[in-house]
Curated annotation (Swiss-Prot):
This is Defensin Ec-AMP-D2. It comes from the Eukaryota. The keyword Disulfide bond applies. Pfam families: Gamma-thionin. The keyword Disulfide bond applies. Gene3D superfamilies: Knottin, scorpion toxin-like. Has antifungal activity. Inhibits spore germination in F.oxysporum (IC(50)=102 ug/ml). Inhibits hyphal development in P.infestans (IC(50)=50 ug/ml). Does not induce morphological changes such as lysis of hyphae and sporangia in P.infestans. SUPFAM superfamilies: Scorpion toxin-like (SSF57095). Belongs to the DEFL family. Disulfide bonds join 3-47, 14-34, 20-41, 24-43.
C-alpha cells in the first residue's frame, strides 16, 4: 500500500513531478507527484 502526505517543504505551485519528488526525498519519502488544480506537491511512500 502507498501512503500520501502533502509536502511541508515544497513552495509554490507544483508543475513538474520530478521537482516535487526531489523535495519529498529530502523529507524522507520515496517520491512525490503534483496533485490537483492548484498543483500541490504530495509525497508518497510505502506503508
Amino acid at each position: 500500500r502507498e501512503c500520501q502526505s502533502q509536502s511541508h517543504r515544497y513552495k509554490g505551485a507544483c508543475v513538474h513531478d520530478t521537482n516535487c519528488a526531489s523535495v519529498c526525498q529530502t523529507e524522507g519519502f520515496s517520491g512525490g507527484k503534483c496533485v490537483g488544480f492548484r498543483g500541490r506537491c504530495f509525497c508518497t511512500k510505502h506503508c
